[in-house]
Structures are given as C-alpha cells and as structure tokens.
C-alpha cells in the first residue's frame, strides 16, 4: 500500500490548473476540491468512494468526481494502477462547476461503458503532458475539450444541476467538517465537539462521516497525524517523541500503535530506513 501522504504531496506538487499522472497502489484519504477529477483504472483493482457510494473498480473502469464531491481511493491489500486527471474547467473556457447544465447518471462506469474515444483522449493527454511535444500546451487544451465532449456524448447523463439534500448527509456540511479536521488535526478533536460546533446530532454525523469517508472519525484523524509524522521523520532530525506530540498524539505508545497499523512499521524503523538511504 502506498502511503497516503506521499500520494497527496506528489499530486499537489505537480498540479496547477491541470494535472495528469499515473499512480500505482494509490491510497488517498477522503477529500474534496472544486476541480474536476477523473480516475481511469489501467490495471488491477481498488476501492473508490464518491460521496455516499463506494465501489471496487477493475481495469478499464472509470470514476468521475465533479466539483465538491467527497472522494477517496483505497488500494489496501490490492494492486492497482490508475491514470488520475485533475483540472480546473474554467481554465479551459468551461463553467467552473462543469458539467453545469447536465449531470452524469453515475459516478462510476464499467469498462463496457467507457467508449474508445474517451480512452484515446485520455492517453493523448498523458502523452502530451509527459513528453512535452512541440506546442503541447495547445494540444492539451484541445484534448481536454475533446475529452469533456466525449464524456458527455458517450456516458449517460441528464439535464439538471447537482443538488444536495438538506440533511446531515448534506455534502456541504461534511466538506466543512473535513476542512476543519484537516486544519486542526493536531489538536484534540472528538465526535461530541464536532457535533456541537456544527450543530448536528453526533449519531447522524458519525454515520454520515463513515459512509462518505469510508473510515470512522478516529481512524481518519490518525491517518492525517501519521502522514504529517512520516514527513517529519523523513525530513527532520526531531526526536520521535517530539514529533508524536506535535502531530497530536498524547503518548508515544498511541503514536507507535497508529503508525504501525497505517504504515506497517514503527516510527523508529522508518527513520532507520531513511538513514540507510542517506548513507548510500
């Protein structure tokens, strides 16, 4: 399993208004953003969650996250390779919330539903972005528009805009909760505290959170904490106990337990690996 933080950093580092890349065994925590995101499974299989739906996708399948969708990728105990495309529609002359006048009938599409023209446009984008042929920026602009047209032409969709139900499962509420957690995960965060802050019943919040993120609150927070800790272990000489407390763990024991569960090894083992690589 490729660790979540590594995927998160590599995607953000290479991404501006457009980004396309290949990821092996990606596991990426539930998140949301205003950009359009498409994941095409080249090989193997993985779990993908989008809003309240979670499916296991295989080679040839496609997943689409439109602006504001909460989504995650999970390759735990699986092997997968995906092409991940993220772009700002407005950068290409489209509405920021494209598709703005239609709604895709689903977020997941099986291999037989993915037309060859969609695959061709996607691989052409990957080639132009990787090899930087002459005038590749213009070709990328043209191919993004071609891909969007192919998605609308060949995937089932219907007129209308995306609507959120006025309930605790409201994605806008969960977006706010996720943003708060990401900005404050090193502090003490409990279900009761979140329910008071966002004025929602704790049972309903917990149920909606699990449904959308695929994890309970504690595991989600610990994943963020361990991700930051891994970065600090690999890039600083801070004592591990200091890192544990800085990332929000209240004891070295709880840090060791969470780190081993999520990465498969202890923090000290991670540091030893880093030291050995630096000495080579």
Task: Give names to the regions the model predicted.
Residues 105-116, 129-140, 148-183, 187, ...:
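Short, Lys/Arg-enriched, Trp-marked, Pro/Gly-tolerant hinge/linker segments that flank
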């Amino acid at each position: 399993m490729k660790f979540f933080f590594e995927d998160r950093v590599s995607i953000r580092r290479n991404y501006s208004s457009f980004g396309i890349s290949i990821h092996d065994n990606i596991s990426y925590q539930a998140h949301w953003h205003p950009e359009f995101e498409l994941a095409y499974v080249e090989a193997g299989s993985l779990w993908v969650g989008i809003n309240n739906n979670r499916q296991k996708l295989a080679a040839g399948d496609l997943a689409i996250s439109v602006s504001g969708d909460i989504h995650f990728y999970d390759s735990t105990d699986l092997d997968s390779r995906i092409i991940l495309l993220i772009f700002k529609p407005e950068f290409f002359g489209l509405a920021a919330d494209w598709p703005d006048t239609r709604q895709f009938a689903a977020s997941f599409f099986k291999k037989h539903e993915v037309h060859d023209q969609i695959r061709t446009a996607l691989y052409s984008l990957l080639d132009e972005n990787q090899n930087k042929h002459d005038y590749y920026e213009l070709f990328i602009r043209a191919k993004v528009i071609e891909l969007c047209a192919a998605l609308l032409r060949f995937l089932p969709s219907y007129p209308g805009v995306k609507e959120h139900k006025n309930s605790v499962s409201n994605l806008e509420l969960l977006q706010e909760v996720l943003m708060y957690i990401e900005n404050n995960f090193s502090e003490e965060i409990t279900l009761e505290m979140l329910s008071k802050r966002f004025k929602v019943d704790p049972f309903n919040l917990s149920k909606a959170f699990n449904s959308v993120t695929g994890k309970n609150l504690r595991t989600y927070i610990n994943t963020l904490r361990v991700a930051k800790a891994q970065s600090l272990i690999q890039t600083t000489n801070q004592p591990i106990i200091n890192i544990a407390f800085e990332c929000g763990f209240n004891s070295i024991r709880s840090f060791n337990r969470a780190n081993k569960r999520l990465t498969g090894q202890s923090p000290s083992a991670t540091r030893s690996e880093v030291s050995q690589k630096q000495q080579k």
